[in-house]
């Protein structure tokens, strides 16, 4: 009988990626097969997130439910990973002594040894929440594609130390994967028919990966190299930081058509005073200047962002500045949250002087405004021709197919299942609140998807690029040095 593994994942897309790698690793080394049923599992892992309020208590509530399973099955292995584990490892050990393995985001590659150690020494537990230098990627098996789109982590951690954020304390400072490792993983995915990659990192555009000859590959260089990989026709990335959005990255949008017309660039607030309190390192006008440059190159670029509502000291004027920035930029989507203090962060020491009622009212107004903008953009797409990557059957109607536009809109349409994993052109016939409908007008066999520039030319261009200094970009935003 095969051994079963159950993983529950909370939080960001990086956590989703890490959970996928855990499953692949434990399958390759120990033959564990994933199950959706925790009661059927031999190993249960909880991959946690510490961004939201009461994250720790949520973890202990979940562990309390799993303790009942362990009472009935003493050999069950329970592990806790992710950012809460990194931040609260000792507390988890004390409050939940039945947990066998506690590991951080940078030590998940050691899971097979940890589990083996616990199984060999009944009643013992293992805690490893250290920050080894991104060695986990050297220990992971070859990636397994799950559809035509895939996530690839290119760097870990963040060195910006925004006053509200726990990431530098839970995932460590910025460390980039060597460029050859990233390109190999993407090439392996392309061989498995992946057509779109989404590059992941807490501060992805701060990427500075080592090359085989001891040089530094910057994020803009990396994008050009990825675009040269045969079969990769779309490139996305998340999450980026405005301070790191240098001119060379703006320039990539002019000469790499594989880079999509959609950008997620968190701003958090439109008030310079609040941005300063957050230690974001830029102003609202500098943020908008970057967007203006991008839209000169890509007029149809759609934007999404993160917003924190009710940061300590936020006045009505500060909130109005955020609403003005939203109107000026024209966001398509947002991840917006009411501020809650994270233990150990500098902002936790500030007086939380915005009432809950004010926070809720402001959040409602902000989300309503962005929803209106998103609906307007959807209506503007009516009767336009859109190229979409077909991901699979529609989630609501299995007789239809589902694809995604460059600007990250889901389109449902009727078509043959043979086009799953391929690009098709559709004409948008209906704009719904959360998706679009379209009619199939062209399949990939009728397109010319060959790039006009040969891959060798792209590689030559990337190799000839001069190193970029970590100084000041064109709009006067200094690269942050902690």
Curated annotation (Swiss-Prot):
Residue ranges of every copy of the TRAM domain listed in the record: 379-442
Domain MTTase N-terminal: 3-120
Role of this protein: Catalyzes the methylthiolation of N6-(dimethylallyl)adenosine (i(6)A), leading to the formation of 2-methylthio-N6-(dimethylallyl)adenosine (ms(2)i(6)A) at position 37 in tRNAs that read codons beginning with uridine.
HAMAP family for this protein: tRNA_metthiotr_MiaB
Cell compartment(s), UniProt: Cytoplasm
Gene name in the database record: miaB
Cofactor(s), names only, from the UniProt record: [4Fe-4S] cluster
CDD domains: Radical_SAM
Keywords from the named record: 4Fe-4S, Cytoplasm, Iron, Iron-sulfur, Metal-binding, S-adenosyl-L-methionine, Transferase, tRNA processing
Cofactor note: Binds 2 [4Fe-4S] clusters. One cluster is coordinated with 3 cysteines and an exchangeable S-adenosyl-L-methionine.
Enzyme class: transferase
Protein name, entry field: tRNA-2-methylthio-N(6)-dimethylallyladenosine synthase
Complexes and interactors: Monomer.
Keyword Lipoprotein annotated: no
Residues annotated as transmembrane: none
